């Protein structure tokens, strides 16, 4: 994660998976005319639906089975990180309050807890009960009243998550979701896998995350367009090489309540309501 290049449209406090139409997906489409003019390594294009997100890939070079290996790795990561797939390690943690993880995922938990600390709890991976109560995990949206929100906030505190070796433990009323960091982690893992498989250049979108591998095949930087939050236009863009560009905003995943107010999926762990 140390190579990430962050471009923030809205303060990322905590959220669930991005919708299938994202600013980053649009950015990939916007860059495709440039990519089509490139020659050299063979181009591979494919799409994967996983983690509640449409993932789009453009890869140059690499072994013949690189697509198969990318798909397999995504499935492996989703099987571990999913909070809704019965029997997954994350599902087991939330149900049993104690779970033994593979070392790489125990380390991811530690890295996530460090992010929680660094943001003074603005990002809190234990805020899943809040996200769930508002219906963003099921699509059955509702507005919890003030009393319920207070009760939900009392269940949120990343400092109560214990990691001992590869074993993670939480309090009886807690639930954890790594959705706020999961796609960024997945992008990093996939980028490393592609390099191991001989990929010389790649651009791929995982919902709110765009990852680049190397430079474009002509040696120039990738240019990623950043869409305006509430308008069908681009604010500008960034030039990157071998980095990720990550955005999060409430303009893609939200609902309008009976009160006429718009409520988005980015939650404030301190209030139990959208940020």
Regions found by a protein language model. Name each.
Residues 4-8, 14-275:
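Mature catalytic core of soluble alpha/beta enzymes
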């Amino acid at each position: 994660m140390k190579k990430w290049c962050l471009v923030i449209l809205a303060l990322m406090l905590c959220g669930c998976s991005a919708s299938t139409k994202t600013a980053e997906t649009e950015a990939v489409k916007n860059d495709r005319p440039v990519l089509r003019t490139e020659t050299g390594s063979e181009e591979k294009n494919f799409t994967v639906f996983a983690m509640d997100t449409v993932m789009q890939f453009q890869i140059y070079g690499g072994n013949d089975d690189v697509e198969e290996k990318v798909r397999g790795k995504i499935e492996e990561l989703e099987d571990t990180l999913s909070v809704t797939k019965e029997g997954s390690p994350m599902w087991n943690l939330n149900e049993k309050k104690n779970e033994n993880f593979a070392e790489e995922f125990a380390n991811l938990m530690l890295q996530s807890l460090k992010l929680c600390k660094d943001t003074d709890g603005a990002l809190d991976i234990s805020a899943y009960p809040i996200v769930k109560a508002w219906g963003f995990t099921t699509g059955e949206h509702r507005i919890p009243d003030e009393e319920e929100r207070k009760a939900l906030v009392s269940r949120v505190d990343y400092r109560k998550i214990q990691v001992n070796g590869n074993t993670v433990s939480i309090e009886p009323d807690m639930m954890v979701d790594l959705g706020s960091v999961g796609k960024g982690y997945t992008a990093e893992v996939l980028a490393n896998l592609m390099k191991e498989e001989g990929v010389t250049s790649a651009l791929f979108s995982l919902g709110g995350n765009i990852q680049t591998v190397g430079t474009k095949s002509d040696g120039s930087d990738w240019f990623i367009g950043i869409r305006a939050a509430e308008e069908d236009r681009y604010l500008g863009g960034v030039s990157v090489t071998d980095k990720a560009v990550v955005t999060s905003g409430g303009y893609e995943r939200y609902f309008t309540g009976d009160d006429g107010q718009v409520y988005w999926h980015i939650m404030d762990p301190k209030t139990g309501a959208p940020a």
